[in-house]
Structure formats: C-alpha cells, structure tokens
C-alpha cells in the first residue's frame, strides 16, 4: 500500500495539520506570556499591550483553523462517507478541535481555573494525536470524490434521530432529572437542568448510535431491528459510528463545562459501560448480559445527583440499584416475546439458553428483589409518604404482572409485563420527584 498525499482530502488534511501546528505554537507563546489577562473579552478584544495583541492574533488564527476544520469535515462526509477509518477519525478530530476552542473560551471567561487549564492542554494533545494519525491515514487510504447516490434530506434526518434511540433517551432523561430533584430536594435551576439534560441526551444518543454500529449485522436478523438505518443500509457503518462518537464527545464537554467534572465522568463511564462492556463484550458472550449490562442504564440518576450536589451518597446509590434490578425482568419479558429473533441472531438471552420456564421464574424473582429495593429509600428516612405509597401501589401491580408471567406461558402476559414495567419505572421516579418537592 503506497503512501501519497495527492488526493484532495489528503492535501486538506496536511494543510489543516500545518495550520494547527502554527496555532499551537502561537498558543504556547501566549500562555507563557500570560497574555490572556490582557485580552479578557471574548471572542475579540481591544488589546492595550503587545501581549494582548498576541492573544488577539491567536484567536483570529483559531478562527481560520476552525474554517479549515469545517471544510475538512464537510469533505470527509462527502467523499469518505463509507470509509470506516477516515470518516470517524475526521469527525473525532474536528469535534475535539472545537471542544478545545470551547474550553479555551471558558478559560478566559472564568479567570483561568486550574481544572480547565488541564482540560485544555489534554484536549490539545488529543487534537494533535488524532490529526497526525488522520494525516498519515489519509495518505494511505484517502480517495478523491466518489459519486454517491443523492440523499433524501427528510429521511436522512429521521435516520439520524433513529440512531439515537429517542424513546430510550427519553426514559433515561426522566431518571436523570429525578436524580437532580431528589438530590437537591428542590427544583434545580433552569440552566443547570438544561445543560445536564442536554449532555445526558447527547451521551445516551451517542452511545445508542455506536451500539447500532456494533450490532448492525445482528440487527439484520431480527424483525424488531431490521429496519434500523445501518441494518437496512440507508446509512453507512462509518456514518453511524462517526455520528455516535461525535455526540459522545460533545456530551462530555458540555457536562464538564456547564455542569461539573463528576457528572461529566459519570456520563462518560455510562457510555463506556454500554458500548464496551455490554455491546462489545457481554451481549453475545454470556446469558448474564442483561444482568451485568444493566448498570449502564442505571448511571443517569447518578449523573443527575452529581449535577446538583457535586458528590454521591447512599440515596444516589440506591437509585442506581433500583434501575439495576429493574433491567433484567424488563428485558427478559421482551426476550420471551422475541425469543426466536434472539435465537436467529445468536444472542444468548435467557429464554434462548435456559428456556422460557426458567426465564419466567427469574422474572418473578428479580421483580420481588426490585420491589424490595425500592423500600430502601423510606427505610433510611430519605423519602416520605408520597414515595412510599407510590412504591407500594406500583410495586404491587408489577408483582401481579410478574406472577402472571410466572404462571402463564406465552407472549401475551410477557408483553404486558414489558409494557407495564416501562411505565412502572417512569411513574416511580416521578413519585420520587413529587415526594422531594412536597
């Protein structure tokens, strides 16, 4: 395989790399001279000294580099949209570059706190590494513009939305916001709630898109998922992966910049848990995939709690445990209904490996344990009568459905259990919020 920078994409990449080298060198000089304090307005200023002028020139250079980055991103999504290395790598590089600019803006407006200085430096290093790797990769793999079929913009937007699994995102945001209200014992400020929920939505959507990239071949064999954008071939795998990576990176920096670092790293942990531990390692490897993998969906209330308190405590861990215990009976009920799909796709779900009778038994056992866990919050004195009454009522109905699943074979009662368990979790966390506010 011959290295060449003759393609237009490779040339753009090299030119962008050189511009970033100059930008970084200028930024280093500005940092050594502490020029930021002489150009404190953002994005432009009227410098009163040579050091302030140097800072202004650095920002203008960053603006020029930003245009180059946007052009590179556009070119990649036009000419390399089916390349599983170049398109994701370009998307990550450009996203990190703008994340660095975002952190740089926060540095100036927040008087250069140490944590943002460290984040700015580490992000700059990540941009350097990814751009260097992209330049070398473009020399080996880039090609000139290929004629792809025209795109239906409306269908395209619909497919991007589908990649994020919006229904799941909505449920996760309910538990995130409930964690905020329960942690603060009050209604959070609009700005904090907005940034936390936006960051959470992007994190959940990004991990959902990456999950669909990983499962694209599996999804083709399942009736429930065969029409997803990647499985159906309406989008290339590279596009799905790139979109997911971009959303995930943006989510981290939004959390870190506008919420706090603990919430940001918890959100990042949720992405890694879902993508790596569950999607890549557990889903096709063990019958315990749902049990262990359930921790990914249990992280959002921790993120919400950390957003308002800056810490974690026992009630937050109980919220995590509630969702962790809720996940197996919820998804095993679905697995009973979709057993043939999972069997065809080779996914070792409990009904496939141990049979429907054992699965129905485990649904009941885990439901009993789940309902018991929900009473831990009033037991430690953290919640009051509203939550306790709701936990009893909702839990009683859930136990009724679980008992019916245990006693009756077939899809009908399992589907009813699956549908109600979704509403159960939502209403339980809504009750938690009401209890915290009264």
Would you name each region that the model predicts?
Residues 1-160, 169, 187-189, 201, ...:
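Polytopic transmembrane helical bundles with strong interfacial aromatic enrichment
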Residues 37-48, 146-155, 214-235, 332-360:
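Cytosolic, membrane-interface loops and tails of multi-pass inner-membrane proteins
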Residues 61-70, 169-173, 244-250, 293-301, ...:
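Core segments of transmembrane alpha-helices
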Residues 118, 236, 399-427:
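Interfacial loop-to-transmembrane junctions
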Residues 128, 173-177, 228-229, 291-308, ...:
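Small-residue-rich segments of transmembrane alpha-helices in multi-pass membrane proteins
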Residues 178-198, 250-265, 301-323, 375-387, ...:
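Helix-coil boundary and interhelical linker segments in multi-pass alpha-helical membrane proteins
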Residues 224-265, 356-379:
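Multi-pass membrane catalytic core of lipid/isoprenoid biosynthesis enzymes
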Residues 237, 241-307:
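Intramembrane alpha-helical segments
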């Amino acid at each position: 395989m011959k290295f060449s920078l003759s393609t237009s994409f490779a040339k753009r990449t090299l030119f962008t790399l050189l511009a970033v080298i100059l930008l970084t060198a200028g930024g280093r000089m500005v940092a050594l001279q502490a020029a930021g304090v002489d150009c404190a307005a953002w994005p432009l200023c009227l410098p009163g000294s040579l050091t302030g002028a140097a800072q202004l020139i650095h920002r203008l250079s960053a603006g020029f580099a930003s245009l180059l980055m946007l052009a590179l991103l556009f070119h990649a999504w036009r000419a390399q949209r089916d390349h599983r290395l170049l398109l994701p790598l370009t998307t990550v590089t450009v996203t990190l570059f703008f994340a660095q600019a975002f952190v740089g803006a926060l540095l100036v407006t927040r008087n250069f706190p140490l944590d943002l200085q460290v984040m700015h430096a580490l992000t700059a290093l990540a941009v350097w590494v990814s751009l260097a790797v992209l330049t070398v990769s473009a020399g080996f793999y880039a090609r000139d513009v290929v004629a792809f079929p025209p795109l239906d913009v409306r269908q395209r937007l619909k497919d991007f939305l589908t990649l994020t699994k919006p229904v799941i995102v909505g449920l996760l945001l309910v538990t995130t916001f409930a964690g905020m209200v329960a942690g603060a014992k009050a209604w959070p400020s609009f700005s904090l709630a907005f940034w936390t929920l936006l960051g959470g939505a992007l994190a959940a959507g990004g991990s959902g898109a990456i999950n669909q990239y990983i499962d694209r071949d599996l999804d083709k064999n399942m009736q429930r998922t065969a029409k997803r954008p990647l499985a159906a071939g309406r989008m290339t795998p590279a596009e799905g992966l790139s979109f997911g990576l971009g959303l995930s990176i943006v989510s981290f920096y939004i959390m870190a910049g506008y919420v706090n670092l603990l919430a940001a790293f918890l959100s990042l942990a949720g992405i890694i848990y879902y993508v790596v531990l569950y999607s890549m390692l557990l889903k096709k490897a063990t019958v315990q995939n749902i049990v262990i993998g359930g921790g990914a969906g249990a992280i959002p209330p921790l993120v919400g709690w950390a957003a308002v308190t800056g810490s974690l405590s026992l009630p937050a861990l109980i919220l995590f445990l509630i969702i962790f215990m809720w996940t197996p009976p919820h998804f095993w009920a679905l697995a009973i209904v979709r057993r043939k799909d999972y069997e065809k796709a080779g996914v070792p779900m409990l009904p496939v490996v141990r049979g429907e009778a054992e699965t129905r038994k485990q649904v009941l056992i885990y439901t009993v344990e789940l309902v018991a866990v929900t009473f831990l919050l009033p037991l430690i004195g953290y919640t009051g009568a509203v939550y306790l009454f709701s936990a009893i009522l909702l839990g009683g109905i859930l136990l009724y459905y679980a008992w019916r699943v245990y006693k009756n074979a077939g899809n009908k009662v399992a589907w009813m259990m699956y549908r109600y368990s979704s509403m159960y979790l939502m209403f339980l966390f809504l009750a938690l919020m009401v209890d915290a506010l009264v």
